[in-house]
Amino acid sequence: YGTIPGSVPANAAALPEGLPAEPGRIVLFCTRGKLSLETAERLRDEGFDACSLKGGYLAWLMRQMQRQEAEELCSRVENSLRKRFRLKLWCNFTKAIRQYELVKPNDRIAVCMSGGKDSMLMAKLFQELQRYTKFPFSVEYLVMDPGYSPENREIIEKNAKLLNVPITIFESNIFESVLHVEKSPCYLCARMRRGHLYNKAKELGCNKIALGHHYDDVIETILMGMLYGGQVQTMMPKLHSTNFEGMELIRPMYLIRENEIKRWRDYNDLHFIQCACKFTDTCTSCNPDNASKRQEIKNMIKQMSKINPQ
């Protein structure tokens, strides 16, 4: 079998012969971890601080290969933002930041992530911005678990690890709180989520929260307000909080189209959760009756675009 960098060969049967006077912790490994486990147990009985590498060299090698694959994927994703999707994603991201003055020197920004494609892209764009910007600012990648299923929680954590995004997760019981609300549970859920995010961001010393709403979200919100609310309202690129003094909400994806986000996702063969809400655990493809008002608006825009692609 192969070797692990920094390791030294040893005759298991002869140990502890050859060990230094004060060896400290001894980590043993063999091909599959069986012999090293037995040897570690024997050494512990003799008073040594010994342990065995779980799964042996082969398991270690597999973990290393997976890590290399993850590093290669992360590098490919980042290169796609710098090259193939530079104009549609990166340039529109930085344009919104300049045009609406969303990021300023010494800002501490909580990049709020739901685990979907939009917020994960936003996180990667902020990482790029930190690499290339000429002024200092800091970022917290914040994930609120409002009651996700274990499967969705695992997907979020694995994607963050895969894309090298150091997330901070905190929990709330929002899904349970709105589960029995009959009228506008989604609206109430959104308001409660934002309040929790503001509160946690402020606790972490942030002065801004960044949300992953894109250009299409803005259009859909205007139409939803007109058709279902009888009023004209929209999402602004930035808002000062009225309930959390000194806090500001920014939307740096304001000029990015959703189709471009989907192209980036599919080009890199990435897979994210969609709506992880308990109301939509049976997704709309399985249960069309669960389709939301926003989905109705999306469908309407899709039909209109066939008549006028512009």
Predicted regions and their residues:
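Short active-site oxyanion
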Residues: 5-6, 24-26, 207-208, 247-251
